[in-house]
Swiss-Prot record:
Taxonomic lineage from the root: Archaea, Methanobacteriati, Methanobacteriota, Stenosarchaea group, Halobacteria
Binding site for NADP(+): S12, G13, F14, T15, N310
Subcellular localization, as worded in the UniProt entry: Cytoplasm
EC number: 1.2.1.103, 1.2.1.106
Keyword Cytoplasm: yes
Top-level enzyme category: oxidoreductase
Annotated pathway: Amino-acid biosynthesis; L-lysine biosynthesis via AAA pathway; L-lysine from L-alpha-aminoadipate (Thermus route): step 3/5; Amino-acid biosynthesis; L-arginine biosynthesis
Alphabetical list of SUPFAM superfamilies matching this protein: Glyceraldehyde-3-phosphate dehydrogenase-like, C-terminal domain (SSF55347), NAD(P)-binding Rossmann-fold domains (SSF51735)
InterPro entries given in the database record: AGPR_type-1, LysY, NAD(P)-bd_dom_sf, NAGSA_dehydrogenase, Semialdehyde_DH_NAD-bd
Protein name in the entry: Putative [LysW]-L-2-aminoadipate/[LysW]-L-glutamate phosphate reductase
GO biological process: arginine biosynthetic process via ornithine; L-arginine biosynthetic process; lysine biosynthetic process via aminoadipic acid
Active site residues of this protein: C147
Organism, as annotated: Natronomonas pharaonis (strain ATCC 35678 / DSM 2160 / CIP 103997 / JCM 8858 / NBRC 14720 / NCIMB 2260 / Gabara) (Halobacterium pharaonis)
GO MF: N-acetyl-gamma-aminoadipyl-phosphate reductase activity; N-acetyl-gamma-glutamyl-phosphate reductase activity; NAD binding; NADP+ binding
Length: 346
């Protein structure tokens, strides 16, 4: 019997299904409840066909069971509305939405539609374990980082850690994301006939994850997001212009110093073969992030690359990683598996 009990609220969506998949093989956590308003009493496998062997039915979110950890896989606005019920049911709440990622109420006024529980913002711990794992043990509310923000922050973090960037430089972030980012509900733009074959700018400016990136790097960024023809993945290409000259040796040192002890980060910079730089296809289905860089001395530019599976490192995998740390479990538990290769068309 696993040592900790878990419930998944909003379990019929893509992120909820991914959390269920991870917990189904977790050595220390067992799912005792999965909720869905739309599919109450239906088997989990009837909605998530990859989980047909899971002996669990969806229950009502109005009847939450007492558990050690609750994963809230709900749309923006739901967790802040129901956080009291979530906390009554669980010692630790891991929220996969944006409801508790930002620090202050004014940020929600600017980037979202306000916040109705601002008194809880300073009690929630942002979860990108490579950034702040020391804040997670014993946390009551864990706000799992967003997929686009995670991709960008993972790539840029070593440049700040290594004092290559100080905060006043120009930073341009271009992220390309898969269709699963739109969720199971999707929409016209996410349907196969509309999505197939596209490289579509959908947030040239003003993407909400820009606030998340700026908050945790402490500097402004110019952020653009494109929808592309893949199901899973987020690929960030970041263009930065350091004020002082930078060598490849400086970059290698900075990235190794930041990530050499990180269990879910791989440094991929040049080399030979097809996969010479980070690519979402190489991490599909896993909690790994690949990061890399290239130097453009002619234009005094550093190009940084980061690739994640938006459903894993950008969502469910990161949430389970954070929950492991919050509960005092070995942080890699249930996540130490490679991605899928080859991966076919979306």
């Amino acid at each position: 019997m696993s040592g900790y009990t878990a419930s998944v609220v909003g379990a019929s969506g893509f992120t909820g299904g991914e959390v269920l998949r991870l917990l189904s093989g977790h050595p220390e956590m067992a799912v005792t409840q999965a909720t869905s308003r739309s599919y109450e009493n239906k088997t989990v496998g009837s909605i998530h066909p990859n989980l047909r062997g899971m002996d669990l039915r969806f229950s009502s979110p109005e009847e939450l069971e007492s558990v050690d950890v609750l994963f809230a896989c709900t749309p923006h606005g739901v967790s802040m509305e129901h956080i009291d019920a979530f906390q009554d049911a669980a010692d630790t709440v891991v929220d996969l939405s944006a409801d508790f990622r930002l620090d202050i109420e004014s940020q929600y006024d600017e980037w979202y539609d306000g916040h109705n529980r601002p008194e809880l913002l300073d009690k929630a711990e942002y979860a990108l374990p490579e950034l702040n794992r020391e804040n997670l043990p014993g946390a009551d509310i864990v706000a799992s980082g967003g997929c686009n923000a995670t991709a960008a922050i993972m790539g840029l973090k070593p440049l700040f850690d290594g004092d290559i960037l100080g905060g006043g430089e120009q930073i341009v972030v271009d992220v390309k994301v898969g269709s699963s980012e739109g969720g199971a509900g999707g929409g016209e733009a996410s349907s196969h006939p509309e999505r197939s074959g596209v490289v579509r700018p959908y947030a040239p400016t003003g993407h909400r994850h820009e606030a998340e990136i700026e908050q945790f790097l402490g500097t402004g960024v110019s952020f653009t997001a494109h929808a592309v023809d893949m199901t899973r993945g987020a690929s960030a290409t970041c263009h930065v212009y350091p004020e002082e000259p930078v060598s490849k040796g400086d970059l290698w040192s900075a990235f190794r110093e930041s990530y050499e002890d990180e269990p879910f980060v791989r440094l991929v910079a040049g080399g030979s073969g097809v996969y010479r730089y980070p690519e979402p296809k190489a991490v599909a289905g896993s909690n790994y992030a690949e990061v890399g860089f290239e130097l453009d001395p002619t234009n005094k530019r550093v190009v940084v690359f980061s690739a994640i599976d938006n459903m894993m490192k950008g969502s469910a995998g990161q949430a389970v990683h954070a929950a492991n740390i919050a509960l005092g479990i070995e942080e890699t538990a249930g996540l130490e598996f490679a991605g899928l290769h080859p991966v076919g068309a979306p």
